[in-house]
C-alpha cells in the first residue's frame, strides 16, 4: 500500500487529504478517488491538470509512497498580461 497526499486550494479554502492506495495506482486514478470534486463543486477531476511536488505530470504517472498530488487551477490571466497591468498601475 502507498500513502499519498492530495491537495487542492482556492484563495479562501484549501484541502489536504491523505489516502491509502494500491501499488501501481496512477495520479489520475488517485485524483478521481479522492472525492475532492464533492467538496469543490466546480472542480472537474477528469480534466484538471495534476502535478507531484510542483511538477506537472501525465495522467498515467504511477504514484510512489509519500507523493503529494497537486490539483492545479487554470490561470485566470496570462502572467505577462498581469505583469503589464501591474507596471501600468505603478506608473499612474
UniProtKB/Swiss-Prot annotation:
InterPro entries: Mopterin_synth/thiamin_S_b, RnfH, RnfH_sf. It holds the Pfam family Ub-RnfH. Belongs to the UPF0125 (RnfH) family. HAMAP family: UPF0125_RnfH. This is Protein RnfH.
Amino acid at each position: 500500500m502507498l500513502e499519498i497526499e492530495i491537495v487542492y486550494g482556492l484563495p479562501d479554502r484549501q484541502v489536504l487529504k491523505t489516502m491509502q492506495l494500491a501499488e501501481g495506482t496512477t495520479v489520475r486514478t488517485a485524483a478521481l478517488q479522492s472525492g475532492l470534486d464533492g467538496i469543490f463543486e466546480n472542480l472537474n477531476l477528469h480534466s484538471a491538470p495534476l502535478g507531484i511536488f510542483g511538477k506537472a505530470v501525465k495522467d498515467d504517472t504511477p504514484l510512489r509512497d509519500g507523493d503529494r498530488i497537486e490539483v492545479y487551477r487554470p490561470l485566470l490571466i496570462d502572467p505577462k498580461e498581469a505583469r503589464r497591468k501591474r507596471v501600468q498601475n505603478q506608473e499612474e
